[in-house]
């Protein structure tokens, strides 16, 4: 099969543009690996390419969920893997692009997910409602310190999942993670990044553009489609901050600074995660000739 290319890295580095140019060069099709770009109607806040900007290149795993549906790594892994194999079977090159860390690792390392038990999960969800996310995070720290250290103390959904896995398997949550070996399908992996100060400025401009382009109106429109009922969609960067500002009696504009700060924090987490992967060939987003560099990396993988 045609060897895939994965273009990964922090938010705001230009991954989509590079992937698009690469796909044009090699006759490729794009497979999205941004969790929130899976949602229909979540366009401005996720910097999703418009149909016109996609230049006629097929895109997969975009606009496949309604905001009331829960985005899961397991669903994505199965669907995206099927897309990649179908693309390759028709002689095109799969180009994976995104910055959602678990999505990318699950796809390239064939992550095997532990079983789930609705009763056990319901128990911890009830516990979350009873004692709050901070206290439940502390409980996780007592049974699996490593998992607690890797999960934000505000991420109730992942805390519940970690406790569920620990109870069902009797092993630490990390034991279910894949080992980093040869990437699936012999995929070439490119990481795109910028100098920190430059990327911070890019993120500031990106955030300003989202609000200027109508992010608040997009959130208001999505409320009519059930955004508040979405377990994952309502927590997306930008959307969660706008909702909080609206709930506090604001007009949404007060969410700009919290969105920027949250995005910078997320970028730090992305960098920390991706830099652990020795398979990634890093490129400077400021360099000229990025597509040629990507082609060299892709052709060099054996």
Swiss-Prot record:
Cofactor: Mg(2+)
Residue positions binding ATP: 9-16
Any single biological process term in GO: tRNA modification
Catalytic reactions of this protein: adenosine(37) in tRNA + dimethylallyl diphosphate = N(6)-dimethylallyladenosine(37) in tRNA + diphosphate
UniProt keyword Transferase, yes or no: yes
Keyword Magnesium set for record: yes
One Pfam family linked to the record: IPPT
Quaternary structure and partners: Monomer.
Physiological role: Catalyzes the transfer of a dimethylallyl group onto the adenine at position 37 in tRNAs that read codons beginning with uridine, leading to the formation of N6-(dimethylallyl)adenosine (i(6)A).
Full protein name: tRNA dimethylallyltransferase
Species name: Mycolicibacterium smegmatis (strain ATCC 700084 / mc(2)155) (Mycobacterium smegmatis)
Organism classification: Bacteria, Bacillati, Actinomycetota, Actinomycetes, Mycobacteriales
């Amino acid at each position: 099969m045609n060897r895939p290319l994965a273009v990964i890295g922090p938010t705001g580095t230009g991954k989509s543009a590079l992937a698009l140019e690469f796909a044009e060069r090699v006759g490729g099709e794009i497979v999205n690996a941004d969790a929130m770009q899976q949602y229909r109607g979540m366009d401005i806040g996720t910097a999703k390419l418009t149909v016109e900007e996609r230049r006629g290149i097929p895109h997969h795993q975009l606009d496949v969920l309604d905001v009331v549906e829960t985005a899961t790594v397991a669903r994505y892994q199965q669907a995206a893997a099927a897309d990649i194999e179908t693309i390759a079977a028709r002689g095109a090159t799969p180009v994976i692009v995104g910055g959602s860390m678990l999505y990318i690792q699950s796809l390239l390392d064939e992550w095997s997910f532990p079983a789930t038990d609705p009763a056990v999960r319901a128990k911890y969800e009830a516990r979350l409602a009873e004692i709050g996310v901070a206290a439940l995070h502390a409980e996780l720290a007592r049974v699996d310190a490593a998992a607690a250290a890797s999960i934000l103390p505000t991420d109730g959904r992942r805390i519940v999942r970690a406790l569920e896995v620990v109870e069902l398997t009797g092993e630490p949550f990390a034991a279910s993670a894949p080992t980093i070996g040869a990437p699936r399908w012999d995929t070439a992996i490119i990481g795109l990044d910028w100098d920190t100060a430059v990327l911070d400025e890019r993120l500031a401009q990106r955030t300003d553009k989202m609000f200027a382009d109508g992010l608040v109106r997009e959130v208001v429109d999505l409320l009519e489609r059930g955004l508040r009922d979405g377990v994952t969609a309502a927590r997306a960067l930008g959307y969660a901050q706008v909702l909080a500002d609206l709930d506090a009696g604001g007009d949404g504009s007060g969410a700009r600074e919290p969105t920027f700060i949250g995005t910078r924090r997320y970028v730090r987490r992305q960098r920390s995660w991706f830099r652990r992967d020795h398979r990634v060939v890093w490129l400077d987003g400021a360099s000229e000739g990025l597509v040629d560099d990507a082609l060299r990396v892709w052709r060099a993988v054996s």
